[in-house]
Structures are given as structure tokens and as C-alpha cells.
Amino acid sequence: MKTLLTLIAIVLAVASAPAADKAGTNTFCVQLIRGTEENKPPGAGNKPIDDRLDKSLHRVFKTKTFWEVQRRTVVLQDSTKAQVALNGKRAVEIDLSVPGKRRVATFENGKLLSRAIRPAGQAMTVVGGDADEKNVWFIVVRRDVPP
């Protein structure tokens, strides 16, 4: 029974993984997320985040609602890095120069805020900070593209 459950979990994980890019090509979805205590979007064009990300963030943070402020797609070759500007103040750098690792650095007004190093696989990287007492922001780097 335990073996069957393990096999089912593996099949579900593979089935839910995004399709692989061409060899050496890596596509990432970068999202700028804002968390608020309001039920209405904090800005024009902001939309609720997808259910998967919402559940992940609500497991950790008590913020009432999370909004996608901006979304960008980044295509990188292995062993390269790129910096993506978001909303004029924030930026993220995705660095694939170390084989098997994905380094993500966040910047605000050109100043380094944080750096995270993760395996280069399919998992998402979430980094962020406080906007003020009632608002938080996150930059999410993920391989899957939400609806």
C-alpha cells in the first residue's frame, strides 16, 4: 500500500510539472505580488493571484488578500543570468551560472535586499518584504505559468 501511494504521488508530481524547455533553455515566470488587508485591488490592473500561490502564501502569512501587480516572462540559457525590472522600484536577478543552482536576488531602488539559492528544478522561489505596516510584497520566480 505504501509503495502504491508513493507511486501515485510521483505520477501526480510529474503530471503537474510544466513541460520541459529545450535543452539549455529555461523559462521563468516572475511575479510582483502585493499583500493587503483590503478586498479591492491596490492598483489599476492588479488581479488576485492563482490558487496554488495563494494557498502557499496563506500557510505562512496572515495577510488577507494577495494581488499580482506585475508579471514578466524571462528566458535564460544555462550558465547565464538576467536582471528584470519590476514597477520602477524593484528588480530581480535570476542567475543560472552555477550548474544545478538557481540564485535569485531582489533589489529595491538598485540596492540588494536579499538573495536566495535553490536547486534549479521546478520549485518556486519567493522573496519579499514589508511595504508598510499593513502591506507586504513578494517577488515570485517560478517555472510554471499561472492562469
Model-derived features: positions:
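Glycine-rich phosphate- or other oxyanion-binding loops that anchor nucleotides, phosphorylated ligands
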Residues: 17
